[in-house]
Amino acid sequence: MQTPSSNGFLSSRVNVNYQLNKILTQLIRSIVDFISAPTSNSPLPPYVQIGAAAAVTMGLGYYLSKGANSTGSYSFNGVTYTGNVKPLVDPMNQSRVLPDGSRISAYLKDDNLQAYLFEDAQTLYQGVRRGARLSNNGPMLGRRVKNADGSAPYVWETYNDILERAENVSVAFRELGISVGNSENIGIYAKNRPEWIVTEFATYNYSNVIVPIYETLGSEASVFILNQAEIKIVICDDIAKATGLLKFKEQCPSLKTLVVMEPLTEELKATSSSLGVSVLTFGDLERLGKEATNRPEHIPPTPADLATICYTSGTTGTPKGVMLTHANVIADGVCMDFFKHSGITATDSMISFLPLAHMLERVIESVCFCVGAKVGFYRGDIRVLAEDIKELRPTVVPVVPRVLNRLYDKVMSEVNKSTLKKMLFDFAISYKARDMANFNIRNDGFFDNLVFKKIREGFGGRVRLMITGSAPLSTNVLTFVRAAMGCVVVEGYGQTECVAACTVSMEGDSLAGHVGMVIPSAQIKLVDVPELNYYAKDNAGEVCVKGHIIFKGYYKNEQQTAETIDSEGWLHTGDIGRWTPEGTLKIVDRKKHIFKLSQGEYVAPEKIENIYVRSKYVAQSFVHGESLKTCLIAIVVPDVEVLVPAMEEMGIKGTFEELCRNEKVKKAVLDDMLAVGKKAGLFSFEQVRDIFLSSEQFSVENDLLTPTLKSKRPKLKTHYATQLNEMYAKLP
């Protein structure tokens, strides 16, 4: 006799639900088709047919989905959650207040911060070797290789393969005169690919320090980095980068060797020879190490040793070298301890496309390597990233808001073409939001198959964990992504000076609009900012961070270090935060880049830009103001996929460039921005008075964005100086 809790009963129930799902999905697809073209033979008017069919659709969907997959019962202070994800802590009390007013994660059992995930992985050197053991020398790094038949599957190298290559490269560094120890910096100037990781772990074998050079730092910044870090050797991925560095050899006396990951040209050989720089391929470098007879014992780094100097291109001024130790990077990976339901294991695969010079990417990869997971690289071309993701079918996806915003805009532009689709889509989102509020994360329900399946399949159909950060993500976009993906989607907040993240949202927490709770390796306090009327007594102020994740200072720059880390060890981020009633952090403003208008009002342009990006027409914006002016203006890059069809419906046709020059189009965009701003609670002085529509996107390539996709405000001001001056000249 079977009981309701027996496996046989559950198996039967799952099978019945699956069959019902299949039948009803087909039924409702037929209803959707019917609504798109209601029959003229019916005695009922078309709108009645549509309403009845829509009601049947939603009713059946609700009935089938009701209560499905709710497998737990977890109570906190009288509130019960019945989803399949157990809340890590009480969702209504996610942080604990210490006597000094600072906060730590409620996940911690005492007041001691957590320094690492695993006892046997306290450095990155130890971490990858732990992964090799746990995976039993499983696949580690993959790249797509094109076959004769045109297919391009991922081809994998094992942990031992990569460690052997790293061994040879590290020995080759010795052959080329690179000293052992933390005083020697190795430069790398390349897109994400296996050789990047090989170089990184080769660097750690003898406690050297890896210094990434961003692709678009510009020549002046690159020269500064090479000289300040006294870099002797740079690993480049292509001829163009190597050639670019050689142009400035006379300004970089320390540069002695260039290694290129592709075949050398005769021109490059001749140029490098004339400048006294050795040049060889990455294959040559590996062979040099493999054939070397002198193979000294490794000098593994300690947790306190530097792992990397990560130069922040910054939105202003000269690059600053953020010194991060092995302990720092390992401690930031502790945030992954939050994920008990969706934690990374040896069976996981991650897609790597965010720049490896970006610490968010490196932290997540370091955790993958600690547990024996595998990482597949995109082909270096963002235009075919979707194809790479579909081929890899990753389970872990780090992503930036810009990618998710584009996905949302694309889906919504399609959904808005049909009243029925919009009704069904909104209902599905609402239902899923209710389900998620109960900590129920699923992708096998009725609406998952009917409405969201294509979106999931666009990411390969296997994603379990999606991590986003680096910029704010609007509430509606985050809720959409969580509903559509049917997996754990978390948002983090931080900066390079605290490695990557100092807060991360709890898995299963569906409440959007915050950036999560303090990670276990950090503590946070809010400090008064009286000029902006933010006070700690009101649970608001500048976000200050302390703990194992705080950087050791700016390389060879004690003055800026002292300006950023106070005497008690608190990192002052320049961001304004507010504690929510649930004990999570919400970023509400920016202390940096604030300016005062002529009437004395302070303005935080980044806050305004983050609101305007919610306008359906806006892809990017740059809000500008001056101390001698009374109002704000903005440069706006419209979303081409939304603007063109929307204007056609209004009877305005033309190319994207032509539309950007059309005054009627400008008015439509400005009106929508002002409506969004008003709804978000912007004061009148925070609303822009005029805009210029630019058909040129802000990008890393045109030097208007940092590699972490933040606006370079001085560059934008210079780039659009003519348009800004003209707008102010026309205003009364």
Name these PLM-found stretches.
Residues 2-4, 13, 22-96, 205-287, ...:
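Structural core segment of the AMP-binding/adenylate-forming
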Residues 65-76, 151, 240-303, 411-454:
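ANL superfamily adenylate-forming
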Residues 78, 277-282, 395-398, 408-511:
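Gly/Ser/Thr-rich phosphate-binding loop
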Residues 116-119, 137-201, 218-223, 281-283:
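Conserved AMP-binding/adenylate-forming core of the ANL superfamily
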Residues 136-139, 278-280, 287-311, 318, ...:
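Conserved pre-ATP/AMP-binding loop-to-beta segment of ANL
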Residues 156-160, 307-333:
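Conserved AMP-binding A3 loop
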Residues 330-352, 356-449, 462, 484:
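Conserved AMP-binding/adenylation subdomain of ANL enzymes
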Residues 529-538, 542-597:
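Conserved ATP-binding/catalytic segment of the ANL
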